[in-house]
Amino acid sequence: MSGREDEEEDLGTAMQKIPIPVNVFDKEPMDLDTVFGFADGVREIIEDSNLLLEESREFDTNDSKPSRNFSNLPTATRGRLHAPKRSGNKRGRQKRLSFKSPSDLFDSKFGITDKSCSHCGTRKTPLWREGPRGAGTLCNACGMRYRTGRLLPEYRPASSPDFKPNVHSNFHRKVMEIRRERKSSPPNSFGFSESYHSTRKLGF
């Protein structure tokens, strides 16, 4: 039998030994001495049962799991975690706007720069290409013809400041016609061929 069962048996045996007044189950009222005597007997049993309960608790604590000791746990810090502060120079920083003149804005919009093409002299081109004088020396149109071997002296794009309709063209077929005419006609006293004057009259 376990300690708790022994305790219940001792408590029940002690309760049986208490003299119960005869008038407890009667309808007639009992006197005060009888009531106080019964209460004193119950009080003694309760006090004795407390001793039995203490012994049973010691017995139970040996077999029970060890209780957690919360005193050894680290206490929570009172300080709050804060996000890292950003440096002040990054907040509110505004990029400085560089103001350009209207002419500069127009030139940058249409690709006009201070650089000029070494063949046609144009400054307006979407892309600078490699030429016989190095990288970025020809405009896009002249650079494409240079890569294919068709960059001839008679070729000029329409945007070239040196473009002359009677001696230049931006079409390869027309360029070849101008070259054939120059080779077929002998130059006159001014150094120009007859084909030069004929193309000038026709408006080419």
Swiss-Prot record:
Biased composition (Basic and acidic residues): 57-66
Gene3D superfamilies on file: Erythroid Transcription Factor GATA-1, subunit A (3.30.50.10)
GO terms of molecular function: DNA-binding transcription factor activity; sequence-specific DNA binding; zinc ion binding
Keyword set includes DNA-binding: yes
Chief subcellular location: nucleus
SUPFAM superfamilies noted in UniProt: Glucocorticoid receptor-like (DNA-binding domain) (SSF57716)
PROSITE patterns, per database record: GATA_ZN_FINGER_1, GATA_ZN_FINGER_2
Alphabetized Pfam families for the sequence: GATA
Transcription listed as a keyword: yes
Composition skew (Basic residues), residue ranges: 79-98
Similarity comment text for this entry: Belongs to the type IV zinc-finger family. Class A subfamily.
Residue spans of biased composition, Polar residues class: 185-196
Zinc finger annotations (GATA-type) as residue ranges: 111-165
Protein name stated in the entry: GATA transcription factor 14
Ranges for region Disordered: 57-102, 180-204
CC per GO annotation: nucleus
UniProt keyword terms in alphabetical order: Activator, DNA-binding, Metal-binding, Nucleus, Transcription, Transcription regulation, Zinc, Zinc-finger
Locations listed in the record: Nucleus
Function: Transcriptional activator that specifically binds 5'-GATA-3' or 5'-GAT-3' motifs within gene promoters. May be involved in the regulation of some light-responsive genes.
InterPro entries, A to Z: GATA_TF, Znf_GATA, Znf_NHR/GATA
Gene coding for it: GATA14
GO biological process, one term: regulation of DNA-templated transcription
